[in-house]
Regions:
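Short, polar loop motifs at secondary-structure junctions
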Residues: 58-63
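Short, surface-exposed ligand- or partner-binding patches at beta-edge/loop junctions that are enriched
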Residues: 99
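Rhodanese-like catalytic fold shared by cysteine-dependent sulfurtransferases
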Residues: 2-8, 12, 16-49, 53, ...
Length: 139
């Protein structure tokens, strides 16, 4: 009986594995720290629909100059003093859609900003994932 039940559970688990969303289309996942991570398409769609949204690129100035999302503001997360000074001037009533190169810096920025009372969303995989999906950048 146990073998039948385990086999049934395994079959159900395997059959649902292929039901995940296409790359770039999944919407939300929240790691244990509560930061909401959005796939690139969901990220930009939600940012466009959100009248309080601000796109925030937390890469270096050099990286930003090489290409960024249209309309994004830049604050360098790797320069802690400048980053802290920059976020101290931001409006906490706005919603911030944050990205970096691959997702590590943006996640750290989201954690820091969320602790300070900002509403934030992180883009999954950063601009590398964005461009891999053929989505446009501005120079």
């Amino acid at each position: 009986m146990k073998k039948i039940l385990l086999s049934l559970l395994a079959a159900v688990g395997l059959s649902t594995t292929g039901c995940s969303a296409q790359a770039g289309q999944s919407s939300k996942s929240a790691p244990s720290d509560g930061i909401i991570v959005l796939a690139p398409q969901a990220f930009i769609d939600q940012a466009k629909a959100d009248t309080t949204s601000i796109l925030l690129d937390v890469r270096t100035s050099k990286e930003y100059a090489e290409g960024h999302l249209a309309g994004a503001q830049q604050l360098d997360y790797l320069n802690p003093e400048a980053f802290d000074a920059g976020i101290s001037k931001l409006d906490k009533s706005r919603t911030y859609y944050i990205y970096c190169r691959s997702g590590k810096r943006s996640h750290g920025a989201c954690q820091k900003m969320q602790k300070q009372g900002f509403k934030v969303y992180d883009m999954e995989g950063g601009i590398l994932n964005w461009t891999k999906l053929g989505m446009p950048v501005e120079i």
